[in-house]
Amino acid sequence: MKKRIPTLLATMIATALYSQQGLAADLASQCMLGVPSYDRPLVQGDTNDLPVTINADHAKGDYPDDAVFTGSVDIMQGNSRLQADEVQLHQKEAPGQPEPVRTVDALGNVHYDDNQVILKGPKGWANLNTKDTNVWEGDYQMVGRQGRGKADLMKQRGENRYTILDNGSFTSCLPGSDTWSVVGSEIIHDREEQVAEIWNARFKVGPVPIFYSPYLQLPVGDKRRSGFLIPNAKYTTTNYFEFYLPYYWNIAANMDATITPHYMHRRGNIMWENEFRYLSQAGAGLMELDYLPSDKVYKDEHPNDDSSRRWLFYWQHSGVMDQVWRFNVDYTKVSDPSYFNDFDNKYGSSTDGYATQKFSVGYAVQNFNATVSTKQFQVFSEQNTSSYSAEPQLDVNYYQNDVGPFDTRIYGQAVHFVNTRDDMPEATRVHLEPTINLPLSNNWGSINTEAKLLATHYQQTNLDWYNSRNTTKLDESVNRVMPQFKVDGKMVFERDMEMLAPGYTQTLEPRAQYLYVPYRDQSDIYNYDSSLLQSDYSGLFRGRTYGGLDRIASANQVTTGVTSRIYDDAAVERFNISVGQIYYFTESRTGDDNITWENDDKTGSLVWAGDTYWRISERWGLRGGIQYDTRLDNVATSNSSIEYRRDEDRLVQLNYRYASPEYIQATLPKYYSTAEQYKNGISQVGAVASWPIADRWSIVGAYYYDTNANKQADSMLGVQYSSCCYAIRVGYERKPNGWDNDKQHAVYDNAIGFNIELRGLSSNYGLGTQEMLRSNILPYQNTL
């Protein structure tokens, strides 16, 4: 598990940039114009075996002890070159040593260069036996990469393993600019361990020191090393001034952590954000524990709560062991329902409505797999805390294909549902689903005939409170058996478009499906995990109307659809359009009186859906989709976007998204009852844009307008300045952050962020547009 981290002071001094860099275009090319390159043929092999060539105006010697070269002295060996006004070579016999000690003194305008570094100074010294080297009062400049500095004394030791600087400095800024630099009384760089030790380290902006540490051990190279990361700051209306100072801890080869003290002025305390990553035989995972010891704002707003501590715990794990065992964890829990309203966090959002806590262990071999899992939900609504958890759930699949012309499958599930409230129904559900398929296909079409049996048993408990308040009663023991029959046929027709577009190919792909499921009254079964599934074009051909198993709607229907695609001469899809409908011969029912459209007794063409994509050119693209459901008496959902994209930094995108309140209520019934902001549905039009506005300046913006509420939904604006040695990013974001029940409108949070990045320490010379686009609450999605 390898990690490269740009530390706060890391990779200072020449040694920081010995790793090869890949350079982005434009700005990177401009920056490299100020960096010297190695223009001599690169020599491979052991330099000790290569000849030494010396040129000078004058030479004299006392063989074999001394030799003096003066006047434009130029010494070359392999890739190394030494120039000076005067060079003195000394050779002395050392007692007990088979070889004499050979040293060199260089005086006046000393210039040393190779394929990695250039050293300049008035005086230099070297031991030719050990390769130890000293340069006094020197400047250094990296070759082929950014990085330069000064030192009172620069020393090479341990066969060039160690570089030691006395009163040294480093910056990645080009000559003539010292916007930032790092200085230290002593700096030791170990190339083998890829670490730099700094004593009395000072980070300076211009001539002003802004950070001091008596000792720092910083990573240099690919090996992971502990150290401070680049700090960050922002201002929000929720927390006022915020400051982050992350620290990276390299614990072991298979685990590391990032510890971030996060100061929030309005909260009056520091939140400790701790991220831990690990790799084991059972898989890889990540844990996050955020802890705020006390929150004065929360304490004022919730005076009846015993504690004002705020916390989040997140655990994600995925792994395979012995090729047959699967382990997965997706666990998020917070201290209170308001947590994601008050704090930004990449592991959750205030718009989610709930947090999931799921553990699963699976076993899989050929033709068989089984999974045991538990799933719980933490609902963020303070008004409705009722939610069901699966404790536990067993899923089993057995496959046997090519049984003659048939494919077979048996799916089984056993689950126990528990509610967070002690007066709600609970149940144990056992489900068995044998399936047999007859797939037939050739080059131009396919038909799949499927028959299955849906057999489910419920053992429901804790029914007294519910039955006493509802006219429809739940039964303790319920058996439901339903056959299902489906025939799904597809064809693909293809033609050349020589008359209209030479080299282009068009396909026509009709599809038809018949589905039959008999009606079973399910009013005596409580709805534990079912909700309406979205009916986009591909969803029209599902065998189910609802997710889960508690509501299986009857069906006597034909679904028809057609897709047409156009490919260019390089087989790239340039255009597609899909349109489909479901025609009901009889009403689709479950017997649940809470599903309002079942009382309408509707048949005929009830559900329509369409999707389209048009890659107009290499820079223009369009996507759209719409779903109409007559059972909801409305367009259920729709979305559209058109985009101009010149490259990753230059793009403009227009969007529209819509979801009817009836659709939200049908698909998210429990969340809809408490999510006041969605009672009128979603109807938003917006734009996203990114463009360099001047040399080294780029701007990103996003704006969405709620046409239902006639007000701004959310917006974002970011500006970044990029240079060869630093980048500064300033951003503003306004986003919804909860609902005010008293005033009946959304609550918004305004955030201003500020970030500085040191350049020249990595291959990133980008304008920052992609990072700013992804930071929005509704992140940019590519249309092309």
Curated annotation (Swiss-Prot):
PANTHER family in alphabetical order: LPS-ASSEMBLY PROTEIN, LPS-ASSEMBLY PROTEIN LPTD
Gene: lptD
Disulfide bonds, paired cysteine numbers: C31-C724, C173-C725
Protein name: LPS-assembly protein LptD
Keyword Signal in record: yes
Protein's job: Together with LptE, is involved in the assembly of lipopolysaccharide (LPS) at the surface of the outer membrane.
Subcellular location: Cell outer membrane
InterPro entries documented for this protein: LipoPS_assembly_LptD, LptD, LptD_C, OstA-like_N
